[in-house]
Amino acid sequence: MTMTKTQVLDLLKEHRNERGIEHWKKRGVKDSKLKSFGIGLTQLRKLAKQIGRDHKLALQLWASDYYDAKVLGLLIDEPKKVTREQAERQVEHLQGGYLAHVFSSCDATLAKTPFAFELATEWMNSKDPVRRRCGYGLLYELSKKKVKGMDDDYLLERITFIRDQIHEEEMWVCEAMNTALMGIGKRNQVLNEAAIAAAKAIGPVDIDYGEDNSCEPLDVLKHLTSPHVKKKFKST
């Protein structure tokens, strides 16, 4: 049965997490009216599966002033009903990039749209850092799939660009580029070798996640040289 926005908000209230709310108050977006029920992404994914795909409800939740509701809106949207115009509107309201990860990466609905590759290419070359971040987030998701136009030559050029430009970028774009490099390098043997060479040339990528956060920057080289990845290529 289709749920209403009110029912979803009631569901979120039932799952509110006081510890998460305190964390939000410390880490939330400055100068924003956005509120939070303090619910983690893992729990929100479970709720999204419970609710099911619903484009109309997704747009209603996106219009909410609760972070958790906006995330659910992104998770339950229907890829075939999302338009370029909608994506361009939403990317303008990611709360300074706070919602960028769920919007463009992290198994994002946007990466499942028919225009995802075209959008990723356009956004990676944008003058807007939030769009660039999202473009690389999409590239990471797309690197897991077969996509028309995204051949090895295209990805080798992107590896070179990441290698040469990553340390010139803003911090969160840097993080997205680093993640995309890892995704590309797991695609096949040729791209793996190129991505490893790039990762060695790049060296450490510093990301400031804050003093009260245990997150550490992604070690791309470690991932790309792991026994699991090596075994994957030996079997192909």
What annotation goes with each model-predicted range?
Residues 1-236:
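Alpha-helical scaffold domains
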